[in-house]
Structure formats: structure tokens, C-alpha cells
Amino acid sequence: MKTIMGPLPAIKFDKTRQRKIWFNSMVFAYIGWEDSRNDPVKAVTFGDGKPLPANIVYDCLNILEEESVAFPWQKGDVLLLDNWAALHARRSFDPPRRILASLCK
């Protein structure tokens, strides 16, 4: 099985905030989804099918790392974030992991 999307714009315009936003997970497709069905080098391409040069992907990864903010969690904490305003992820963790999540509108 193979998933093909796109082409998708890396940047969208958020009408609520009246500004351009990075709305894309291309870096994570390149660095994080390698398995028997996914070749990271071919995971992100230009519209003509040519792969994005690795140095550009890694430049984007470095920018994401420089701009990242870590929240030090404490028992009882709750974090609400706007998926349009912030790209979110998590760092690696040591087991056991317990997932408590809720989606709200």
C-alpha cells in the first residue's frame, strides 16, 4: 500500500490571523516514516516528481528545532493548542507511556 498526496502547498493563509502559516509535515515524512513501504528520499517531491534535495529538508528541520518550545509537564497540567497556529510534536520518551487525550471544539 502506498499513500500519495498532493501536490500540497507548504504555506497556507490563515484568514483568522490574516497571516501566512507553515502548514506542512514534509520534514517528518522525510526523517520519520521509513519502513518497507516508504523511502524517505522519495517521500517528499516537487510537483514534477523530483525529490527535494536533502540539504533543504535538513535546513527546514534545523529551523523547526531552533523555533521549538518545550513545555515541562507537571502532574495535573493541561495544555490547549491551536493546530493552525502551532506545529506540535513530542520528544522521545522512556516507557511506560500513558496517553490521555481529548479533542474539543
Residue spans of the language-model regions?
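Active-site environment of non-heme Fe oxygenases that use a 2-His-1-carboxylate facial triad
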Residues: 1-78, 84-105
